[in-house]
Amino acid sequence: MKPSHTIRPVFDDPNLVSTAGLVPVLALAESAGLYDLLTRLSVPSPNAGAKSVAVIGGMLAGADSIDDLDLLRHGGMPRLFAGVRASSTLGTFLRSFTYGHVQQLDAIGGDLLAGLTARVPGVIAGAQDLQGFACIDVDDTIREVHGYAKQAAANGYR
């Protein structure tokens, strides 16, 4: 006999946290100036900085789709991170990005790397004598988007 359903682990216990490792990582990002840098982002959306940090945190925790960003709201996560938006809100936020906004995020990433270098020696070899070089390779995959709920969407990044 085979069961007609699959078991899916869910972290809904208010005392459990599935991704506690985000706490030191986001604290380091904050000390390197991430939150101040995100104020330069000109996306026409309220609280763009908080939404950006939520997306970054979700990606660090393994979210690879907009729906997966909901993992930041399960279990005891609201005790650790205040103001995490719903995944549908974050999806609307991400869909408002233009090419110029992506370039702004690229500049913010470069400035954040400089801030991290000042706090974590050795992130870039040779950073002390200004001869350091860092190459960060982040690949994306563009795929067709299908589905009744995806009106007016042709391509998506993954």
Across the structure, where does each feature detected by a protein language model lie?
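Dynamic "connector" segments at or just before major functional cores
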Residues: 1-158
